[in-house]
Amino acid sequence: MYNNRFKNFLILLISFLFVLPAFTQVKLLIPMESTQSDHLKAYGIAYRHLMNTKEVDWLLNYRGGSFMFGYSTTLEEECKTKGVSYELLDGTMTAQVYSDSKNEENNTDVVRLEKVAKIAVYVPPNALPWDDAVQMVLEYAEIPYDKLWDEEVLTDKLKGYDWLHLHHEDFTGQYGKFFASYGSAPWYLNQQKINEDMAAKLGYKKVSQLKLAVVKKLKEYIANGGFLFTMCSATDTYDIALAAQFTDICESIYDGDPADPQANSKLDFTECLAFENFTVDLNPLVYEYSNIDVTGQLLQMGQFNDNFSLVEFSAKYDPVPSMLTQCHTAVINGFLGQTTGFQKNLLKKNVTVMALKDGTDYVRYIHGNYGRGTFTFYGGHDPEDYQHAVGDPKTELKEFPHSPGYRLILNNVLFPAAKKKKLKT
């Protein structure tokens, strides 16, 4: 009887030892193809997993850019709670996924995400009559972030953050060039006062001088390894402010003295990150900064003809633009902003084009390197509100959990966590 019990114990022990390796190799896969139940919340799960000092494998171009995790009951329960589709993989299935992703014949690869990026959003303290797409999607995905503005930027508070977002900011000091339409509106006057007070507090005579100082500090942040992501008017006004630093493009309604009528001949493009050889619109009543933007051209096409296509990159040779363009669709519905897109011929040669309107030179999404960091510019205001106007209601992202336009934003949040690896030659 004793021997039988001992034999049974040995059988159970041996069985356990054989099963254990298979169990420890079980993975949880979050597929990101069109069948995913909530694409946006999937990014939040990946981000929080990284916050807990755990690694995530980003499977570039594999089933829509899927995420693979070491299995835990906690992770599985979180997927259920957040309404995110997932699959459980045993050891054999996991090996097959890695094999498929690493196959030289496939435009796929595995990128290991290791260290979560600490996020900040540049936003003024006053309430403005429009919403910020990045803040909305971060909150929907439940990704934590901090807010900061000019004073924090100029007092070196950025050093504690890996990734910074700028949205709908006018770095030229012209308050968005809203004067003609909203110059007497309470929100506009409040915006002007808050900016002028901040400029005076920090020792600047003009708001344009304050914003130029901020832009230069942001450029220093990128050079030191920061990741900058901008949308809407923060894309082109960033470089316009740098180009105009030796002249005056602001009329008296904005800064109390006239603009230099020869300002365009005095622009210096050497310090610009992304654009060159552009012309600034000096009319203070025209709701446009320069000829970089293509909003007018896209309006003429009409909403139903406005879409843009993602450029396909080699996952193995160009991992960064590949990460930034992961999506479950290659064509995305367009959406307007104060700055919607960029004229291709005005881009610097070192800028990578990641999306554009087919058959045109209207670019929507670009990326580049500066120093040890990177910048990404994404035209448009709200990916799920085609022509978001001042005072329009907030977009409810629970109605758009599969939004490809918002998904591009979240790609930018995750890619700084990628383990750097030597590129193949």
Q: Where are the regions that the model predicts?
A:
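Catalytic cores of eukaryotic secretory-pathway lumenal/extracellular enzymes that build
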Residues: 188, 203-204, 211, 243-246, ...
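Extracellular ligand-binding/catalytic regions of CAZymes and related secreted enzymes
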Residues: 25-31, 37-68, 347-352, 356-425
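Catalytic beta-strand/loop cores that center a nucleophilic Ser/Cys/Thr
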Residues: 132, 139, 236, 266-390
